Amino acid sequence: MAKVAKRIQKIREGVDPNKLYVLTDAISMVKERAVAKFDETVEVSMNLGVDPRHADQMVRGVVNLPNGTGRDVRVAVFARGVKADEATAAGADVVGAEELVEIVQGGKIDFDRCIATPDMMPLVGRLGKVLGPRGMMPNPKVGTVTMDVAGAVKASKGGAVEFRVEKAGIVHAGIGKASFDAKALEENIKAFADAVIKAKPTGAKGNYVKRVAISSTMGPGVKIEPSSVTA
């Protein structure tokens, strides 16, 4: 336990929790402190000036990160016939209709993202209590309810990231791996921030982006000057 505490303390050294760093410096600090034996995920967190309890202040969307996420995303597609064949050809990991619904209802969720054709939604709607809390429910607003299942599968596999603001007004996402070069992480973070800004709801008043921070899986959070991310 003492060794673990000492290692954590060493990782946190040099990070001032009260200072706002420019994005490039923050990325360097996060990469330097990602010393775990696995390739840590780099996550960005944005605290927004919204109250998602109000419908006109909900923030959600999807962004295609220019350099991908660095993770293997397993995609499930609810479709029949030709569309099911298109999804399989595009690289979907799981494809089905009624039988897939039954599998998910049984508690087996061996995928990270769901896509459905519009005609499947009455059936998929039964899975709201299972997929909803996991943020996996297909939604036309983020392109996961579509007839272009092949395009949606390729986007999901290629770096598409969904985001949705949480109760505390925070939106976050994994935007790459610590092994990415600094420029790739910078481009991904700016793409994510740009998408969040474009998703600003009509009900948002005052300062929209309040705080921004990035961290690796096992590393400390590094606060960022918002203007260096949103510029």
From Swiss-Prot:
One of its GO terms (biological process) is translation. One of its GO terms (molecular function) is structural constituent of ribosome. Pfam families: Ribosomal_L1. The keyword Nucleotide-binding does not apply. InterPro entries: Ribosom_uL1_bac-type (IPR005878), Ribosomal_uL1 (IPR002143), Ribosomal_uL1-like (IPR023674), Ribosomal_uL1/biogenesis (IPR028364), Ribosomal_uL1_3-a/b-sand (IPR016095), Ribosomal_uL1_CS (IPR023673). Keywords: Repressor, Ribonucleoprotein, Ribosomal protein, RNA-binding, rRNA-binding, Translation regulation, tRNA-binding. GO terms for cellular component: cytosolic large ribosomal subunit. Part of the 50S ribosomal subunit. Binds directly to 23S rRNA. The L1 stalk is quite mobile in the ribosome, and is involved in E site tRNA release. Protein L1 is also a translational repressor protein, it controls the translation of the L11 operon by binding to its mRNA. Belongs to the universal ribosomal protein uL1 family. NCBIfam families: rplA_bact. This is Large ribosomal subunit protein uL1. It comes from Agrobacterium fabrum (strain C58 / ATCC 33970). The lineage of its organism: Bacteria, Pseudomonadati, Pseudomonadota, Alphaproteobacteria, Hyphomicrobiales.
